Amino acid sequence: MSTMSDLFPDLVEEILSRVPITSLKAVKLTCKQWNDLSKDSSFTKNHYGKEAKEIQVIMICDLKACLMSVNLHNHKDLADPSIKQIGKLNQVEIDSVFHCDGLLLLLLCNPKDNSKLMVWNPYLGQTRWIQPRNNSHKHRPAGRFNHRPAGRFYMGYDSNNNHKILWFSSMYREYEIYDFKSDAWTVIDVNTDQDHIIDNQRVSLKGNVYFIAHDILKEEAFLLSFDFTCERFGPSLPLPFHCCHEDTVLLSTVREEQLAVLFQKSDAYEMGIWITTKIELNIVLWSKFLKVDMTLPNSYWFEDLSFFLVDEKKKVAMVSELDIETCKNYKTYILGENGYYREVDLRKSKGCVYLCVLMFQVWCKSSKVPVLARCERK
């Protein structure tokens, strides 16, 4: 009698290539041969390349992390977005999320243990719990939850692909690094300019974290990076525009290869989006991606933008802002060239699409194969 182990390798690979990412973990347990094949680099590259035709994003829906699949152009008429839920983390309530190379760093909403962190790999269903140092992570009333840490957490990796977590408090000028390999926190000595304020706009790209920062004396914004190999902040890098603290500046990534920045001036009816043509720790070059004239008919002035995505192929951007009237739902729009403008009601889509006020970050996974780094401790 034949068994699954007797199947030809090509046939097994074809079978596994048709399995959705969210079901792959269960399938791997079927037999050792299937488990070994799923870990093969050539297979994962081909398999996840097929899965990446749609943009995958993380949304915080009713304090739960949901893995969503977004298609900005189902049809040929530029953009016909759809959205569906393909995964959900139900066990915990989440305050904030930070994405790094396929892994998610979650800060939990737990009054009894208010500094608990979880790292989640939604593709493999793996989780890892991390406890910050109690004596250093001071808590102060802030925002929606008064147990939120005064500092912030960010994740990246060094030149050896070893993942790390950065915690720092701008208020107290304190910095710590958590090393996944050693499972330990270390206090680091980092010199930062007292006149610089680091904004909450931040993204991970190629292992480093990039921030929007403000120079108080010069009254201008700039790009700042943190290098997890050297465990130091990089030099100030220019943005492709001059802005003040009242203007809207958002960061995003494109295919995990480039940075994108959105700029809306507080006193002008115009929005611009730029994409990097070169990005390193000490140099950045920008190219204009999209210009939106908000004086045109049917256009709209955005009051509280929270995130955006770009689709280079269709030359469109998806932006979202908090609904001021309800302070709960998010309004989403598709913007394009020549005055293209369309409002999208994601609440009509299937799946978990009710977005609460804490949903402030979206991450794009397009053409690049996600790194399937393991979260669990050895």
Swiss-Prot record:
Classification via InterPro entries: F-box-assoc_dom_typ1, F-box-assoc_interact_dom, F-box-like_dom_sf, F-box_dom, Gal_Oxase/kelch_b-propeller, SCF_F-box_component
Start and end residues of each F-box domain: 1-47
Protein name (database record): Putative F-box protein At5g51000
Provenance organism: Arabidopsis thaliana (Mouse-ear cress)
